[in-house]
Amino acid sequence: MNNNKRPLYIPYAGPALLSTPLLNKGSAFSTTERKYFNLEGLLPEAIESIEEQTGRAYKQYQSFENDMDKHIYLRNIQDTNETLFYRLVQNHISEMMPIIYTPTVGAACENFSNIYRRGRGLFISYENKNRIDDLLNNAANQNVKVIVVTDGERILGLGDQGIGGMGIPIGKLALYTACGGISPAHTLPIVLDVGTNNPQRLADPMYMGWRHPRVTGDEYADFVEDFIQAVQRRWPEALVQFEDFAQKNAMPLLERYKNRICCFNDDIQGTAAVTVGSLLAACKAAGSSLSEQRVTFLGAGSAGCGIAEAIIAQMVSEGISDAQARSQVYMVDRWGLLQEGMPNLLDFQQRLVQKAENTKDWISEEPNFSLVDVMRNAKPTVLIGVSGAPGLFSKEVIQEMHKHCERPIVFPLSNPTSRVEATPNDIIRWTNGQALVATGSPFDPVSHNGQTYPIAQCNNSFIFPGIGLGVLAIKATRVTDEMLMESSRALAECSPLAINGTGALLPPLEEIHSVSKRIAFAVAKKAIEQGHALEITDEALHQKIESYFWKPVYRRYKRTAF
């Protein structure tokens, strides 16, 4: 696939070629190409290399003073010259990742209709429920291999954004390419526009989505089913990633489709995989195993419960029983600790309740155990925040944990930054530098008592691009829990702290390509072992992954007729 030295035969010419983001080279078109593609006079005289173009683009990028303007600028480059966009992002990955994705993408979703410049991907509204096949045929990219789809109901920690949620599939697929080497020609972002219950969006005259309360129940389920069937007819081998669906839909959709099509839910499974990988690295750095930990969650939604189930599976793989593993995991939501007999729990929450026999000797002034009560009685060694509620990891909570645990592992994972349960600076100060910290959004290193503590970003971008690369390279037909487990273990093996005893918990973003390839290999090996892909040798698998990995370089063009 990575045949950059071979010419590419294309039928477009003139303004049509310059208006095609996947093919446009701008000032990098050669003299010969300008002649044969009717570009003479349409471009300045100078012929530039991609590095010269990137240098100019970076200077322009630096001229913008706020992150939203930088985001809009980068999206404009993406919509005019994709090769240049990805070269620019790869050259400045640590700087630009927070701009093209979290945390800036959250504000971009909230303001989607106000900053809209050009359509990208597909907007499939409920009004067109009987024409989904036609809409898929209208996609700009026709050789689609990976789809990221959302209905916009639970965008990060920001709630229902309607079609504004399209910013998430666009951003996620940009990371599939920038981090995982998936060609942008093979990607398709989709938003299922089933209305919105956000009164601000409905009242906004600029809102571009379907102005209607959200479709729910059987009508909603049937619409999603029609969409999945249409995708299967159009691109039967495509990987489908569900993204930012509300809790009431996320888990049921995953359960319905995970054994029917090649799909996964990044909020549930991707978040779980990167968290388990980070925990494995933290445990290794602390000289212990995951099965020895007592883990408390703040947030018992689909993401938190998905992480918990993945942790339990890893604990069991280390030799303890399922019952023992579940007794070491404590789920806390707004009503307190999930316990036997609690009303109105969802099925996936019921599997994670604490049995009464495990809490019968606990001391508390309230019948529902609070987070502080859990800290005091369970004495957890790991604390994970997926609540979307800022500031709930208070000084009292963290210091109570530190009383019983010399090196607490604290992961406030809520996105964006404004929703984080506690800042790394506070956690480091409250534990006198003893906590191992990873966050969902990027944070600067923390200085405390003369030491600098790098803060790992426990971000799904370390996981899902590698999963996608592994699945697509061997045309795997499913994404299984075991494949995801292998991705966690592969990520843990890349941890500087676990390997060297110093540095960050997770590798720097500058190493993301090697990390993604390592994860891809582990995921693909497990897929082959489980019979979800044709068997090949390890050497051939490495070659497939390398050959599949797209690089942002300009191809030579030759003209062909329509």
From Swiss-Prot:
Cofactor binding note of this UniProt entry: Divalent metal cations. Prefers magnesium or manganese.
Catalytic residue positions: 101 (proton donor), 172 (proton acceptor)
BP GO annotations: malate metabolic process
Catalytic activity of the protein: (S)-malate + NAD(+) = pyruvate + CO2 + NADH; oxaloacetate + H(+) = pyruvate + CO2
Positions of the record's site feature: Important for activity: 267
Binding site for a divalent metal cation: 243-244, 267
Annotated InterPro entries: Aminoacid_DH-like_N_sf, Malic_enzyme_CS, Malic_N_dom, Malic_N_dom_sf, Malic_NAD-bd, Malic_OxRdtase, NAD(P)-bd_dom_sf, NAD_malic_enz_proteobac
Keywords for this protein: Metal-binding, NAD, Oxidoreductase
Cofactor: Mg(2+); Mn(2+)
Single GO MF annotation: malate dehydrogenase (decarboxylating) (NAD+) activity
Enzyme kind, highest EC tier: oxidoreductase
Binding site for NAD(+): 154, 267, 415
Assigned EC number: 1.1.1.38
Family of this protein: Belongs to the malic enzymes family.
Subunit structure: Homotetramer.
UniProt-recorded name of the protein: NAD-dependent malic enzyme
